[in-house]
Amino acid sequence: MIRAGIIGATGYTGLELVRLLKNHPEAKITYLSSRTYAGKKLEEIFPSTLENSILSEFDPEKVSKNCDVLFTALPAGASYDLVRELKGVKIIDLGADFRFDDPGVYREWYGKELSGYENIKRVYGLPELHREEIKNAQVVGNPGCYPTSVILALAPALKHNLVDPETILVDAKSGVSGAGRKEKVDYLFSEVNESLRPYNVAKHRHVPEMEQELGKISGKKVNVVFTPHLVPMTRGILSTIYVKTDKSLEEIHEAYLEFYKNEPFVHVLPMGIYPSTKWCYGSNHVFIGMQMEERTNTLILMSAIDNLVKGASGQAVQNMNIMFGLDETKGLEFTPIYP
């Protein structure tokens, strides 16, 4: 049985980890940490968790003694120093601190210096692309929600040189849970309801993460123009991607079917069928659709994920499974909630 701990257990991704791990047949929760609610039982704060473990302040000695794996569900910049204190525990960080190959890129976009970063062996935790590296990883940087939806939608096309990587346009829409549980006027019901708005235009922190991984896949420099939008729903991301091509839709579709034929969570839809966030709600599944705009030789790719599951906690559990030699679908086999 894998002994699992969670730091940041009372945020949305932390709570989702609790839900998934409580139902995992090969894992048990042995440590929960929260600065805000330390000393209280989790179910006192969130009755829906049915989890009576007492939340505590972060204690590296307790983690090392009681955990085989630690999930850090903290904002960017909060995990790095904590993780460096731990010995003998596998780390899966749901923040951005271990996603980048170049610490200079992290410094540029996140405004923090990561001392000694080059000495930490880490793997970017997108199983569909880095499964073999994840198997032997000690530290995994779990991908961001938007990058997960965009990278999986583009990977086959870039891998097989089916599209032009120089200018990739991404229009993405996310449910409000993607912003976390922080108190902010912008996320009040009366501000979000019956409204749709872009945010962090031309400066979203997930852009360099996308460009890093897409560049590895294509072997060329990749430029991503990314505009995210906040939509009045709780969960889900729908990314619509525009990229130039001189190939036929049939050829591209066949390449996607072949690329993902053995992937349990990625589903390439029949031509003419387009994904909906409703289809992956509460699950680790990804749905990808496509269409060709023949007048302009533009391939339009569409992907739908649940931002809290495949976009965060579900993918983290998938990584845990791989790191401990389990079937990666273990504890994640459930179908989406519908309607």
UniProtKB/Swiss-Prot annotation:
Reactions performed catalytically: N-acetyl-L-glutamate 5-semialdehyde + phosphate + NADP(+) = N-acetyl-L-glutamyl 5-phosphate + NADPH + H(+)
SUPFAM superfamilies the record matches: Glyceraldehyde-3-phosphate dehydrogenase-like, C-terminal domain, NAD(P)-binding Rossmann-fold domains
Gene3D superfamilies tied to this protein: Dihydrodipicolinate Reductase, domain 2, NAD(P)-binding Rossmann-like Domain
Residue positions of the active site: C145
GO cellular component, one term: cytoplasm
Pfam families noted in UniProt: Semialdhyde_dh (PF01118), Semialdhyde_dhC_1 (PF22698)
Family matches, as HAMAP family: ArgC_type1
Name of the protein this chain belongs to: N-acetyl-gamma-glutamyl-phosphate reductase
Encoding gene per record: argC
